[in-house]
Amino acid sequence: MPKDIERSAIRKLTLHIVPLMILLYFLAFLDRNNMAYAAKALEDNLGLTASAFGFASGIFFIGYFLFEIPSNAGTIKFGPRIWFARILISWGIFATLLGFVRTPLELYICRFMLGVCEAGFFPSVVYYFTVFFPEKYRTKILGMFIIVQPLSNAVGSPISGFILNIQHDWFGFAPWQLLFILEGLPPIVIGLLIPFLIKNSPKDVGYLNVEEKAWLMSNAGRSKSGSKITLSDFLKGIKNKKYLLYALLNFGMVCGIYGFGTWLPSTISAISGGDIFRVSLLALIPYGLAALLVYPWSLWASKTKKLGVFAGLSMVIAAIGLMGAVTFFKYDPFVALSFLCIAAIGIYTAVPPFLSMPANISTGAAAAAGLAVVSCIGNIGGFVAPYAVGVLNDLTGSSAPGLFFLASCLLATGLICIFYCAKQREGVINS
């Protein structure tokens, strides 16, 4: 009987919660990464260099870094229903305003504010999952959720390419402006609906029966009824050294993720040539392959309980893919693109097992704060990598040094994960 209750509760939660969270995360990555496809248009219309483009891409994460922990405190204070709505509406506004910028400074301001508004979204979603799902289900749920990272690029790349390939203005807007406006409006609409679509705790959910609610309140990590969250609990999470170590490792992984995502369209264009729509179709291939493999890889990692080893191995594979792409960059476009596919698979399959480790360190407000530390410090890599690659591109006139930089970050982080986590019984960093 308890097993039947458990299965029924998890099935209902998975059907009701996960698709909506996947949609929200899809929109986040769409608005975060669509600028990569507008690089040439922004260069022509705003006079951006590669360094300036990298800076504009990366400054998003400065805003994200500065406001991540305060935003997580907002999730605790106001509850996910209200705070998710605030995040979605505000980020949608600034994502849309990107279509109206006229100078590099306006672009920098809008990208910075987009980061400020979106800050705390991912840790808040992880926190929300832990409220509803017991620990043993979280890696699988995160695996389903994080498929969205490559999937949003796989789906978003041809959409962005199609919009940018429009040959004339619509309603007075150039194609690059339409890209930001059309992809910025949906979060605003969904943000207005969010308070009616989600609840803050299993006990408030109408589609669960009494037995299912009772089981979840007893087994889900962060939904103890009647417990009051204090500031001291929150500060414990920030001071936890395990979270700080994971944050540093996350920095290296994020350098790979956002450095790769920001510069992939430009790299493919340099390798293969062609218009932006052709480039966007080629970009679909590595992202699509990564999306197919993220979930089975996360299931395998969860089954073996060697999360850190699996995450580290993925990062090493990604580094090999990037170095292979550099090696064949000028000699064989097909082989270079194949190595970029390997890099994408490695980068994105690393994410679910890696993020499942800090999610299981503690509970309550301490966990929310700790996850925010991991995310916000790690996301500094989202500024460093795109900007560094842009600077290297300007200095050398080649994409190769930038790709080697990303490969080095991933290789070092992956080897540290494997070295430390292989020693631990559960395959995670415990000391």
Labelled PLM ranges:
Residues 67-80, 292-306, 393:
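Helix-to-loop junctions at the C-terminal end of transmembrane segments
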Residues 66-105:
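Conserved MFS/SLC helix-loop-helix module at the cytosolic interface between two early adjacent transmembrane helices
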Residues 47, 79, 100-106, 117, ...:
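Helix-breaking motifs and short loop linkers at transmembrane-helix boundaries and internal kinks
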Residues 110-147:
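Cytoplasmic helix-loop-helix junction between adjacent transmembrane helices
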Residues 35-37, 233, 237-298, 351, ...:
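Extracytoplasmic gate region of multi-pass secondary transporters
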Residues 307-357:
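C-terminal transmembrane helical hairpin of 12-TM major facilitator-type secondary transporters
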Residues 139-164, 186-187, 375-385:
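Glycine-rich segments within core transmembrane alpha-helices of 12-TM secondary carriers
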Residues 16-50, 66, 71, 156-160, ...:
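Extracytoplasmic
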